[in-house]
Amino acid sequence: PIKAKENIAIINMDDITTVTTITGEKIYDIQTIESGAKEVLDAINAKENSYSKAYEICKNTTIYTMEIRNDYEEENQYLGTIIPTLYTISNKAKEIINSQPFKINKVYLTGTLSVVNNIELYFEEIINGTRCEILKPFFIEESPKNNIKDYIEVNSAIALAIQGLGYGLGDMNFCKKAFSQKLPEI
């Protein structure tokens, strides 16, 4: 749960990236970044011919901080696809966070690209020390048994269920309205 005096940012990295800033438990600002999981998944899918394999590649990719990055770049052939998108997202998110009239105390990461290992360390490094962590549903107990990636998949499942039940915003990342649903009634 968010503390009343805490100013936070939520970076949702799905098709496109959304940065939501919250202050005093109220949404203050929502901005979008055109880069997102879609461009990474599309690029990997073009080589692998499978979106599920592209997702698994992201899930099994580990990114490293500046000090140890050079030793591991050969380890994953898709780092060259994933890192530029994450770099764009993190730098634009940093600009958005720094432009707020109040200091952001914590950044939560969520969405498809948050399955990349060490992504919170990568964002912390670029956002200069603001604490970053993966957004976890409040009702799931934290324990060493639960893999952080399970939280991310639970977040996605909850969002899909809410959309499927007709709640939430129909134009958000998880549910696309059919063209016929967008037409005004006559």
What are these regions (language model features)?
Residues 1-186:
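Hydrophobic/aromatic-enriched cytosolic interaction surfaces used to assemble or bind macromolecules
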